[in-house]
Every structure is written in structure tokens, then in C-alpha cells.
């Protein structure tokens, strides 16, 4: 009897109906990341040099035509008052973001943490290993803290951010 890692699932995957979940990969982290690189809030596509890289997750799609649903939950705070945060999603070494969201911290006090959610749906386009990266930046000077406040962890590491990638048969 072959081991599970020796079984070729190619024929089985071809028989799945459209819309079936083929695989799910996930990373969740409570790790603290800090940085000071700004992300402008303007009408340009965020670049892979802006903000701070906070999380990455790799997937090897089973079919280039399949769809990928990428779901990001990102917790962060900033040392400045009233920052506008940008959360941007990148793939491999591509310079331009695939998707981005902005959120404004309307509380006048610095350091208030916010959770942001970004969802992106796309065609896989490859059957090679591909890595998705999340970068977060603010539009004002100061220090961004990912998963905490003022460079410190909160809630014992369970204030966690995540990336989940679901491959869906096309």
C-alpha cells in the first residue's frame, strides 16, 4: 500500500466539481514586528518597499486555472496620533500590490490597536510554489507595531494576525 505522500491525486482532483475546496493553507502569528517605513495614502499602487513586511504564506496551487481566496487579518498600532494605515498584499517579488485597504484611526490618542481585514480573490496562474506577503504601513512618521502596542506584545501572544489561502477548483 503506498504512503499518503506517494499517492498521485491528479486524476482525483480532475473529477472534483467546480467550486470545491482543493486545499487550505494558513499561518497565524502573535509575533511582534515593528517598523517605521511609511506607506503613502494617495492614488498610486502600494509598492513592495513601502510599509513593513509582517507575514508571508506560500502555496503550491494544483491547477493554474483554479481560484485562490486570500484572507488576511492584521492587528497593528502606531505611535503617532490619527494615522491612516495601509495593509497591502503582494505575491513573490512583484513590485505592485495585488490588493490594498486603508483604515483611519479616528481616536486622537496614539497606540490604539486596530484589526484590519483584507480579502482578495484571483486566478492561481501557476502550479509553482508562490509566496504571498502582507505589508502594513502608516502615512505619518512614528513606529508601527504589528500584533501589539508600542513594541510590546499584548494578551500573551493570542492577539494574532493571520493569512489563509483557499484554493478553489475552477
PLM regions and their residue ranges:
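Glycine-rich, low-complexity segments
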Residues: 1-38
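Terminal beta-strand-rich extracellular "head" domains
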Residues: 37-44, 61-170
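Short, solvent-exposed loop/turn segments enriched in Ser/Thr/Gly
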Residues: 51-53
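Extended, low-complexity regulatory regions
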Residues: 55-59
